Each structure stands twice: as structure tokens, then as C-alpha cells.
UniProtKB/Swiss-Prot annotation:
Chain positions with N6-acetyllysine modification: 28, 50-51
Gene: tat
Domains: entry comment: The cell attachment site mediates the interaction with ITGAV/ITGB3 and ITGA5/ITGB1 integrins, leading to vascular cell migration and invasion. This interaction also provides endothelial cells with the adhesion signal they require to grow in response to mitogens. The Cys-rich region may bind 2 zinc ions. This region is involved in binding to KAT5.
Single GO MF descriptor: cyclin binding
Pfam families found in the cross-reference section: Tat
Name of the protein in question: Protein Tat
């Protein structure tokens, strides 16, 4: 191993940079080319600027989806008042004809 020159910056030490330039190729050899290639190509990590995706605009003939919802009255439940005695009688009358003894 070569001795480290204290007068040089760490990124200029021998062996710190590859001899060939980075490429856009994603083959195994190019993915392990250098640490930057490994992070970007091999692991898919990039710290660069992210492109913003454009939202798809609505077709010109369509309306706003909020305009289509009409105002609706509050939902009210309507129940028949039944006592516990009536429900027992209904259950007994329904259960008797179904017996297969």
C-alpha cells in the first residue's frame, strides 16, 4: 500500500478515484466501478435534485367533481317501535313451522 501524502487532499490520494470515467451503463462491472456508481446504480440512491411530476390536467369537457355532489338532508333512521313481547311472539311463530321432528 502506498504511503499517504499529508499535503494532498483526501480525494486526490492515489487510488481514491477510478482511472476511467463513470458511464450510464448499468451492467455489473459498471455498477461496481466506484463508490458513487455503486450507490447510484447498484443501490438506486441518488442525492441529486428530484424532478417534479406534472399533474395530469382534467379533460376540457369534465366538470369539477365537487360540483356534482348535491346537498343531501341528514340521514334519519325510522324504526318501528316494537316491544320485547312482540318480538318474542314473532320469533316463536316463525320457529314452530320449521321444526322437522
Amino acid at each position: 500500500m502506498e504511503p499517504v501524502d499529508p499535503n494532498r487532499e483526501p480525494w486526490n490520494h492515489p487510488g481514491s478515484q477510478p482511472k476511467t470515467a463513470c458511464t450510464n451503463c448499468y451492467c455489473k462491472k459498471c455498477c461496481y466501478h466506484c463508490q458513487v456508481c455503486f450507490l447510484q446504480k447498484g443501490l438506486g440512491i441518488s442525492y441529486g435534485r428530484k424532478k417534479r411530476r406534472q399533474r395530469r390536467s382534467a379533460p376540457p369537457g369534465s366538470k369539477n367533481h365537487q360540483d356534482l355532489i348535491p346537498e343531501q338532508p341528514l340521514f334519519q333512521t325510522q324504526r318501528k317501535p316494537t316491544g320485547p313481547e312482540e318480538s318474542k311472539k314473532e320469533v316463536e311463530s316463525k320457529a314452530e313451522p320449521d321444526r322437522f321432528d
